[in-house]
């Protein structure tokens, strides 16, 4: 089993963990509705980049 030869100092331990922080989500404003949304996702009104993606059909 692998065992460290020497104790890792607090400084080295913390430097190793420096990239483990939780980063905030990237939130953008929708061009058509003005609401907040995640980038590269369909907006609430079913639009993407200003174009309608899904159009609801009326039930007969």
From Swiss-Prot:
One of its GO terms (molecular function) is structural constituent of ribosome. The keyword Ribonucleoprotein applies. Keywords: Ribonucleoprotein, Ribosomal protein. GO terms for biological process: translation. Pfam families: Ribosomal_L32p. One of its GO terms (cellular component) is large ribosomal subunit. Residues 1-23 are annotated as: Disordered. NCBIfam families: rpmF_bact (TIGR01031). Belongs to the bacterial ribosomal protein bL32 family. HAMAP family: Ribosomal_bL32. This is Large ribosomal subunit protein bL32. It comes from Wolbachia pipientis subsp. Culex pipiens (strain wPip). The lineage of its organism: Bacteria, Pseudomonadati, Pseudomonadota, Alphaproteobacteria, Rickettsiales.
